[in-house]
């Protein structure tokens, strides 16, 4: 059973305020070896040193310990994926403690590597995580309307060692698959994140005009150290230190960092609560780009007209709100690797004069011209409220994204070097969003009903002309939706002798009919020969669907409350979306 306990204390005086909170949570999990235990504490303190000067601190810390059954850190195996694909009727564990095999009875050798119960118990030990976040701030108010703020935030994350014991299928002895020995691993992962920001705010009224202005700057830095050491052949399953193992000691480690610097400003104008204007400008620099391309500039503005405040609409009693909106703005995205714009090398061994030499090899290509991906959004909208019960919004928008960061296929001459992302495409999204809500009361029962709907159509407006890019089944081609599926079309499932006769006839007419894709057997798909050459090849693939982003999304919510009792329900859905499962587990 799960435990969750919290205690809060708050108080203070006219000048000093404090809040202290502590929490303990213990969730044993719904499966073996999947529990999580956490201690957390929070302290908020602020003091008004002078009428014009306030200082404060917010501190938060957690210490969590999780069992590692669901974290297959020795591989990329996904427990839930294999759970869905496990052979029906499997004996997960025999009375003598051995784990059952997932193979068909005729398979040799038998294997329990994907037995989900074994997967839960493969990994023994705990991962302990300490996370501390502290924020210090100060606020100056030199005169009415002007506020100056500054803050510094520090986050420290530390994950302590883990270890692994893997078990043999037949005799229940410790082993790693294929090695016949046990293994212990210690990992340390330290992350430090710092953020500094400063803000200057000013607000004033001139006649019926309210003016609010903000300027500021911020800087963020991130550093990560990761270290791992391992040894094999544990002398005892009860001893989990590195010195308790006797063979094949290894060690590895990495360091990475990135930084961001930003300047920004905003002005809000409000005339008589009728006419609204907001203008923004921000400049961001990211260490993930070369100096020449590091800065991105992103302006935006919005206009609003509250028509219900106009004199000519005051007499419409059933109209509570009618607001027209228009906006235009840009946003930046720097979602690339920390060093994609740089050449970097990795230690690599090679043979020279019949001796093993230690050297360096370039394992990744660079793209020094990488820069910000930028989205430009134009939006028109209406907010309304009627009869003090019905409210809603309607929005129509166009979003053009330029310089999209994507990975392009590399020519074979590049070898096995990793290819960085490029600013290689432009995509346009156009759509409409609608939401409606009804709030009412029947007797002492309050209830609400609401719904939302959106339609979005996207198209690649610029890429490489008629040239396409494939990532699995996701295709990028100018004039098509992004990530439209490019797949073989299924003609039938081979079930009868007549179906198999078609396969045999194709192979008789052309021995290479199934050279690229294996010859289908009973229960397999027979794909369509689209180009009519008698072979099933990539040339028979077709475009399917509207991409991996849904064209239509919708939702419905309703609820009620009565004398302290409440009920609510949310239903959500999406349609006109296509994607392909490429990675599926086997029963081996």
Predicted segment positions?
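Surface-exposed loop/interface segments of Gram-negative outer-membrane beta-barrel transport/assembly proteins
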Residues: 1, 30-34, 40-131, 149-261, ...
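Extended, hydrophobic alpha-helical segments in both membrane/secreted and soluble proteins
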Residues: 41, 263-267, 275-285, 296-305, ...
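Transmembrane beta-strand segments that form the barrel wall of outer-membrane beta-barrel proteins
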Residues: 22-28, 277-286, 328
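Glycine-rich, aromatic-lined ligand/substrate-binding cores of catalytic
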Residues: 548-577
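Solvent-exposed loop/turn segments connecting transmembrane beta-strands
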Residues: 30-32, 287-292
């Amino acid at each position: 059973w799960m435990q969750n306990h919290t205690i809060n204390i708050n108080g203070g005086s006219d000048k000093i305020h404090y809040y202290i909170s502590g929490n303990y949570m213990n969730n044993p999990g719904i499966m073996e070896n999947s529990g999580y235990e956490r201690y957390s504490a929070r302290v908020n303190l602020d003091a008004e040193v002078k009428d014009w000067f306030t200082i404060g601190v917010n501190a938060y810390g957690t210490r969590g310990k999780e069992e590692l059954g669901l974290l297959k850190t020795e591989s990329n195996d996904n427990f839930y994926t294999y759970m869905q694909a496990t052979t029906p009727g499997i004996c997960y564990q025999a009375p003598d403690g051995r784990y059952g095999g997932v193979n068909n009875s005729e398979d040799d050798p038998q294997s329990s590597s994907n037995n989900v119960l074994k997967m839960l118990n493969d990994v023994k030990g705990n991962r302990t995580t300490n996370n501390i976040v502290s924020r210090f701030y100060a606020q100056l108010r030199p005169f009415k309307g002007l506020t100056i703020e500054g803050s510094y935030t520090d986050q420290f994350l530390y994950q302590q060692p883990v270890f692994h014991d893997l078990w043999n299928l037949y005799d229940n002895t410790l082993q790693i698959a294929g090695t016949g020995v046990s293994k212990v691993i210690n990992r340390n992962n330290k992350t430090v994140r710092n953020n500094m920001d400063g803000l200057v705010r000013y607000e004033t009224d001139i006649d019926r005009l309210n003016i609010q202005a903000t300027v500021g700057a911020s800087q963020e830095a991130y550093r990560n150290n990761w270290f791992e050491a391992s040894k094999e052949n544990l002398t005892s399953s009860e001893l989990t230190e590195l010195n308790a193992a006797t063979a094949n000691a290894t060690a590895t480690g990495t360091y990475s960092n990135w930084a961001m610097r930003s300047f920004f400003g905003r002005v809000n104008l409000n005339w008589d609560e009728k006419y609204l204007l907001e203008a923004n400008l921000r400049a961001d620099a990211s260490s993930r780009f070369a100096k020449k391309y590091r800065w991105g500039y992103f302006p935006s503005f919005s206009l609003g007209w509250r028509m219900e405040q106009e004199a000519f609409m005051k007499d419409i009693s059933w109209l509570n709100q009618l607001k027209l909106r228009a906006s235009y703005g840009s946003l930046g995205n720097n979602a690339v690797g920390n060093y994609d714009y740089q050449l970097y090398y990795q230690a690599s061994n090679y043979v020279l004069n019949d001796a093993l030499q230690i050297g360096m090899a370039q394992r990744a290509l660079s793209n020094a011209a990488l820069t910000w991906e930028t989205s430009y959004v134009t939006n028109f909208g209406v907010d309304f409220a009627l009869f003090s019960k019905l409210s809603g919004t309607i929005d129509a928008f166009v979003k053009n994204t330029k310089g999209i960061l994507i990975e392009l296929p590399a020519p074979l001459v590049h070898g096995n070097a990793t290819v960085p992302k490029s600013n290689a495409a432009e995509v346009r999204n156009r759509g409409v969003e609608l939401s409606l809500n009804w709030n009412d009361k029947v007797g002492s029962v309050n209830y609400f009903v609401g719904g939302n709907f959106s339609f979005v159509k996207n198209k690649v407006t610029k890429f490489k002309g008629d040239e396409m890019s494939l990532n699995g089944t996701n295709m990028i081609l100018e004039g098509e939706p992004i990530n439209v599926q490019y797949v073989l079309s299924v003609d039938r499932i081979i079930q009868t002798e007549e179906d198999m006769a078609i396969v045999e006839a194709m192979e008789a007419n052309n021995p290479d009919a199934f050279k690229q894709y294996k010859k289908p057997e009973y229960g397999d798909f027979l794909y369509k020969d689209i180009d009519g050459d008698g072979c099933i090849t990539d040339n028979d693939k077709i475009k399917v669907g509207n991409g991996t982003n849904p064209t239509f999304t919708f939702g419905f919510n309703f609820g009620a409350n009565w004398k302290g009792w409440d009920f609510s329900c949310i239903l959500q859905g999406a349609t006109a979306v296509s994607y392909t499962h490429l990675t599926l587990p086997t029963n081996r």
